[in-house]
Regions:
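Extracytoplasmic/secretory soluble proteins
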Residues: 2-5, 9-13, 17, 21, ...
Length: 528
């Protein structure tokens, strides 16, 4: 007992000395104590005495004042406090388009050009290496205001999924590589009775097929997305909804519709209710091709291994579509293809945007460079530390208490009881001073995606910041786009009407949005 008591005293003494040495080092490097107000992403209120709040305060010689905001009303709540004259030193901008409104209100500080590289070098290095196109995304009028948070997993495009058993039945041995090969296969699926029931009841494709054909012309259109997507044509940025190549896409798809190759129910989509990612048209054997949902919704049972809480590997559960297929038609075989090459040499398919949010400094920090430097140092330390143990600790809690490594190579952790049932516990204890970074994902599911080249030939928007008037016109323009797609494919509008549609689209606000997009692109995109 005496020995254990001595060990406990020694352990406590060592902990005190360690904290003292950290505090001394902080005072030496950061001589002046600074108070910082910070608005992070959080789903639970942060305790001002949370262990990781205190760790950072000691390490960087700061007092941290965390503003707890309801994430469902995040930007609105921040705006209300700003309207009352309270401007935080550092804050998250939940919706990227709101960068413009904060700029109009003059509540953001300009970040000197070399500050990110100098005072947040690991953030800068990660962005430069993995998402260089976003380094300028937080610029307005040529000045940097926002630090971009970029999704690491939106590097994966939509899947191209084919009925492999149907392909075999109609004599096709490999998935299509070109749009011409795709068209040939779709006709076979519709005309050669691939299910062998003697009925004319199959189709090649339905609504998600629009994304595959548009992608073959370099156009990112996906009716599941409600965001504006832009493409670069020459030196200009134009909305994908009026890209000139779209006229050829619609002419081709009208031909398929007229010939009975495209499911006439494409208007209502492939999902008949329930979980959004399910393609009931594919599951129930109505169509032979789908890009509905994300790649992981189509992974079969055992497609990759998962690590259990005991550290053992076991086959993964099936994705949502794969699970339903196993219940409805367990003999069905499907396979994955590459994005199609079109007649103009382009190849691709829709990919969800990677730009998620921004972080910005309050206007008052513009006059306090020391505070800006200190905030960047904390942000860099928590977001992009080269030590994976440290990074995961400042984002998930104390290793051994809150979580443990299951598979460090694949960056898989196990949250320990009782924290495994406490959503947002890490925010409560102060693991909120970071943003999501585009480090290449290493988890086993993403390893499966790399193996199947889901990271190849995705087309994301050429501009993801949004434009000042985007919110004013977005709903109207999106409705026009969706109505146009249906009208041209079904033949309610002749293809000759396309040029008139473009004029009407531009008149309805599209021209203003396009001008703002080009103004931003020319003013804020720099050569590196």
């Amino acid at each position: 007992v005496k020995s254990n008591w001595k060990k406990a005293v020694l352990f406590l003494l060592a902990a005190v000395l360690a904290l003292s040495s950290v505090s001394f080092a902080a005072r030496k490097r950061y001589a002046k104590k600074i108070k910082i107000s910070w608005v992070p992403y959080s789903i639970q209120p942060t305790d001002p005495k949370g262990i990781f709040v205190k760790k950072l305060e000691a390490k960087f010689n700061v007092d941290l004042d965390v503003w707890n905001m309801d994430d469902s009303k995040f930007d609105e709540m921040v705006a209300l406090r700003m309207a009352a004259g309270e401007i935080p030193d550092f804050f998250r901008i939940q919706k990227v388009v709101n960068l413009h409104s904060y700029h109009r209100q003059k509540v953001m500080a300009v970040i000197p050009n070399k500050y990110l590289r100098k005072y947040a070098p690991h953030i800068y290095k990660c962005l430069k290496k993995n998402a260089a196109m976003f380094l300028d995304s937080g610029r307005l009028d040529g000045k940097l205001y926002g630090i971009p948070s970029v999704s690491p997993t939106n590097i994966f495009r939509l899947p191209l999924v084919y009925r492999e058993d149907w392909m075999k039945k109609v004599g096709v041995t490999k998935t299509p590589d070109t749009l011409a090969e795709f068209e040939s296969l779709m006709y076979k699926f519709a005309k050669e009775d691939p299910d062998g029931n003697g009925k004319n009841d199959t189709y090649g494709l339905s609504r998600s097929g629009i994304a595959a054909v548009c992608g073959a012309y370099g156009i990112p259109i996906n009716r599941a997305s409600k965001d504006d997507y832009f493409v670069k044509r020459g030196k200009r940025i134009i909305n994908a909804a009026i890209a000139p190549e779209l006229k050829k896409v619609l002419a081709l798809m009208h031909k398929w519709y007229k010939d009975g190759v495209m499911d006439p129910e494409f208007i209502t989509g492939e999902n008949a209710g329930g979980y959004w990612a399910l393609s009931h048209a594919f599951i129930n054997g109505r169509i032979g091709y789908s890009s509905h949902g994300n790649y992981y919704h189509w992974i079969p049972a055992g497609g990759y291994s998962v690590t259990t809480s005991s550290g053992k590997k076991q086959p993964c559960d099936p994705g949502a579509n794969a699970k339903e297929i196993a219940l409805v038609n367990p003999k069905m075989k499907w396979t994955y293809g590459m994005p199609l090459e079109g007649p103009n040499g382009r190849r691709g398919i829709f990919q969800f945007n990677r730009l998620m949010s921004f972080f910005a400094f309050g206007k008052q920090v513009e006059r306090d460079r020391r505070k800006m430097q200190r905030i960047l140092a904390i942000f860099d330390f928590c977001s992009a530390s080269p030590s994976i143990n440290r990074r995961y600790s400042y984002q998930n809690g104390t290793r051994g208490k809150h979580w443990v490594w299951l598979d460090k190579k694949h960056e898989e952790i196990n949250k320990l009881p009782p924290y495994d049932n406490q959503d947002g516990y890490n925010h409560r204890i102060g693991c909120v001073f970071h943003m999501e970074m585009p480090f290449p994902p290493k988890a086993l599911r993403e390893e499966w995606a790399y193996k199947h080249q889901m990271n190849k030939y995705g087309i994301e928007s050429a501009m993801q910041v949004g434009v000042p008037s985007g919110g004013k016109y977005a709903a109207r323009l999106m409705k026009m786009r969706d109505q146009m797609l249906i009208a041209f494919i079904t033949g309610d509008k002749p293809i000759s009407y396309f040029n008139r549609y473009v004029k009407e689209y531009r008149k309805a606000g599209g021209a203003i949005v396009e001008k703002e997009a080009n103004d931003w692109y020319k003013s804020n995109t720099r050569r590196r």
